[in-house]
Amino acid sequence: MSEREVSTVPAGTDMPAAKKQKLSSDENSNPDLSGDENDDAVSIESGTNTERPDTPTNTPNAPGRKSWGKGKWKSKKCKYSFKCVNSLKEDHNQPLFGVQFNWHSKEGDPLVFATVGSNRVTLYECHSQGEIRLLQSYVDADADENFYTCAWTYDSNTSHPLLAVAGSRGIIRIINPITMQCIKHYVGHGNAINELKFHPRDPNLLLSVSKDHALRLWNIQTDTLVAIFGGVEGHRDEVLSADYDLLGEKIMSCGMDHSLKLWRINSKRMMNAIKESYDYNPNKTNRPFISQKIHFPDFSTRDIHRNYVDCVRWLGDLILSKSCENAIVCWKPGKMEDDIDKIKPSESNVTILGRFDYSQCDIWYMRFSMDFWQKMLALGNQVGKLYVWDLEVEDPHKAKCTTLTHHKCGAAIRQTSFSRDSSILIAVCDDASIWRWDRLR
């Protein structure tokens, strides 16, 4: 398997269209989507930002802060250009916190993405000429549920796409859009779940991070909790984000305690735990599966950010992370020449390689994304502006940026997602609006 290869789903998994499903009880409503290719038909009110509670006060940067690492990454003209071709609005009018394209589809399959917000999960299909078609909508039985995050995978037996969703109630739900059912759910976290991620090479390994200060690794094939990361040296406050590296050997997590922590899952102990989770069969034993409790991260730092760290992603062996300080920081544990796999837990050095600067993004829970090939980086701010950086540059100082704005998009953009072929960028906002930007070739 080449470095950036993800197993794809065979054909024959087209999703049934335009159905509204209940996640567990009866509820009748149809999403009234004011989507139209005609700009003037789009109703978007830009208003106050609905922040997730307890937003930290954003303290101005301390003097001399900008001389970090090798200084600012000056933005030159980006080679990518996008055009806004459509927007629509979900009828619940609550913030949409998450959006994800399904990257497990085959070439030629329709481009499907999911949005989450309020107690709603909605699936859409992108068509030519900017059309966004509603496929399915799911409503949680609890009106107080608020979904924050979603992640796609596929069933390794049937090849059906699967969507995991979670939020304020701390329950992970797995939805099969082919059968249009919530096929399983996991309860374990003691509080809200802020992010879900599937392992890049094993479609059954699901990582969840929570307000309960811990990360959990689940095997959704055998319904086992493989490990809990947290405790003695774990996060001291909500975990807000985490990411697997490309090979799925390491996890980097971050949270409200301003820290970033590295957890290796290719250790003997963890490899064994994952193997045992596959071997476990509750029908053949009375004993419950024993989950690993990982109290000590393999590296930890609080030297990158001075506020809540709400998004982290691997870029090769480097880390991209952001706080509510108007910059995404590119850094690595240890010194420049150190091998990431030889970093010791006692390592106190970090090397900051540069920053992607932007403005008006000082509320928390605003997440950036990259395209499949990690050639582009996208982030929205709290006044509806999108920043796209070209990562394909020799020198990161020369990272080129393009900003995308539309006069009717004025609400906070919570998350963005690129289609697998990078042709479409979707942004979701606090006013329940969805914006489609198509890349101009």
UniProtKB/Swiss-Prot annotation:
Keywords: Acetylation, Chromatin regulator, Methylation, Nucleus, Phosphoprotein, Repeat, Repressor, Transcription, Transcription regulation, WD repeat. One of its GO terms (biological process) is heterochromatin formation. Residues 45-61 have a biased composition (Polar residues). It holds the Pfam family WD40. The modification Phosphothreonine is found at T55. The modification N6,N6-dimethyllysine is found at K66, K197, K268, K284. Methylated. Binding to histone H1 'Lys-26' promotes mono-, di-, and trimethylation of internal lysines. The modification Phosphoserine is found at S2, S34. SUPFAM superfamilies: WD40 repeat-like (SSF50978). SMART domains: WD40 (SM00320). Residues 1-72 are annotated as: Disordered. Residues 81-441 are annotated as: Interaction with EZH2. WD repeats lie at residues 91-134, 142-185, 188-228, 234-275, 304-341, 359-399, 408-441. The modification N-acetylserine is found at S2. The modification N6,N6,N6-trimethyllysine is found at K66, K197, K268, K284. Its main location: nucleus. One of its GO terms (cellular component) is ESC/E(Z) complex. It is found in: Nucleus. One of its GO terms (molecular function) is enzyme activator activity. The modification N6-methyllysine is found at K66, K197, K268, K284. It comes from the Eukaryota. The WD repeat domain mediates recognition of trimethylated histone peptides at the consensus sequence Ala-Arg-Lys-Ser. This is achieved through an aromatic cage encircling the methyllysine, and involving Phe-97, Tyr-148 and Tyr-365. Component of the PRC2/EED-EZH2 complex, which includes EED, EZH2, SUZ12, RBBP4 and RBBP7 and possibly AEBP2. The minimum components required for methyltransferase activity of the PRC2/EED-EZH2 complex are EED, EZH2 and SUZ12. Component of the PRC2/EED-EZH1 complex, which includes EED, EZH1, SUZ12, RBBP4 and AEBP2. The PRC2 complex may also interact with DNMT1, DNMT3A, DNMT3B and PHF1 via the EZH2 subunit and with SIRT1 via the SUZ12 subunit. Interacts with HDAC, HDAC2, histone H1, KMT2A/MLL1 and YY1. May interact with ITGA4, ITGAE and ITGB7. Interacts with CDYL. Interacts with BMAL1. Belongs to the WD repeat ESC family. Polycomb group (PcG) protein. Component of the PRC2/EED-EZH2 complex, which methylates 'Lys-9' and 'Lys-27' of histone H3, leading to transcriptional repression of the affected target gene. Also recognizes 'Lys-26' trimethylated histone H1 with the effect of inhibiting PRC2 complex methyltransferase activity on nucleosomal histone H3 'Lys-27', whereas H3 'Lys-27' recognition has the opposite effect, enabling the propagation of this repressive mark. The PRC2/EED-EZH2 complex may also serve as a recruiting platform for DNA methyltransferases, thereby linking two epigenetic repression systems. This is Polycomb protein EED. It comes from Bos taurus (Bovine). The gene is EED.
